Amino acid sequence: MKRKLLHAVLVASMAVALLGCGNTSGINADAEKTQKATETENIEEERGTEVAAAEQKENTTGTPDENGNYLINGSFEEPDFSGWTVTNNNDVTEELDVYDRETDCFAGAQSLHFYSGNNPVDFSMKQTVSGLEDGTYKLTAHIQGDAAGDENPTVYFYALVDGEEVKADGKLQGYVNWYTVEIPGITPTDGAITVGAHVVTAPGGWGTIDDITLVKE
């Protein structure tokens, strides 16, 4: 009787152990899934400040379009920010998108639009063109909007060449009161130019950026 009882206990213990191994495997799988999901979430969170484009195009051949512009999607006529790396710094800008309201465009039918009601506006954008011929280039950009009473907003465009950055300030001076920024005399020695912009305003700031061109002088 004792042997039968002992045998039953041993069988039950083995069954529990086997079941426990199965559960442990399941828990490990779940933990691995959770870890992978967490890692994915962390990666997405790190990239969450970057406004994704459907396809990140880049001009690596130094070939201009039919208008002589070396930038891709300089007038934001694509449905996304193709060609540009647009970053919503600290995820504070509430609206940062392609705007299809022609009245808010400098040229074409769309523009880059930004707005924040409760948070500050803070975003940056850039695009690199490589494979350029030797010569001198000129960057031109247009911006309009309002800084919501911010007396010291950060609004500038830049050209980065050979590790040196040249800046030109922009202004938010009212609805469709466009301010044109120009940076002439850009002379790369390695065939590459990075152009971009940075905008920071108090809560309530809004505006659009449009028709950015990089042409050979």
Residue ranges: model-predicted function:
Residues 17-20:
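C-terminal motif of bacterial Sec signal peptides marking the signal peptidase cleavage site
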Residues 162-192, 202:
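Extracellular carbohydrate recognition and processing domains
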Residues 75-112:
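Extracellular glycan-recognition surfaces and repeat-rich motifs
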Residues 111-124, 171-174:
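Extracellular beta-rich ligand/substrate-recognition surface
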Residues 76, 123-153, 182-185, 212:
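Extra-cytoplasmic beta-strand recognition segments
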Residues 25-66, 70:
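N-terminal, intrinsically disordered, polar/charged segments of Gram-positive cell-envelope systems
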Residues 140-175:
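Extracellular ligand-binding interfaces
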Residues 196-205:
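Short beta-strand-plus-loop segments that form exposed binding edges in beta-rich domains
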